[in-house]
UniProtKB/Swiss-Prot annotation:
<keyword id="KW-0878">Amphibian defense peptide</keyword>
<feature type="modified residue" description="Leucine amide">
    <location>
        <position position="14"/>
    </location>
</feature>
<keyword id="KW-0964">Secreted</keyword>
<comment type="function">
    <text>Lacks antibacterial activity against Gram-positive or Gram-negative bacteria.</text>
</comment>
<protein>
    <recommendedName>
        <fullName>Fallaxidin-3.2.1</fullName>
    </recommendedName>
</protein>
<dbReference type="GO" id="GO:0006952">
    <property type="term" value="P:defense response"/>
</dbReference>
<comment type="similarity">
    <text>Belongs to the frog skin active peptide (FSAP) family. Brevinin subfamily.</text>
</comment>
<dbReference type="GO" id="GO:0005576">
    <property type="term" value="C:extracellular region"/>
</dbReference>
<keyword id="KW-0027">Amidation</keyword>
């Protein structure tokens, strides 16, 4: 899901 991808993107920023 796109939502999961968004969460992964945020986690990558951290």
């Amino acid at each position: 899901l796109d939502f999961a991808k968004h969460v992964i993107g945020i986690a990558s920023k951290l």
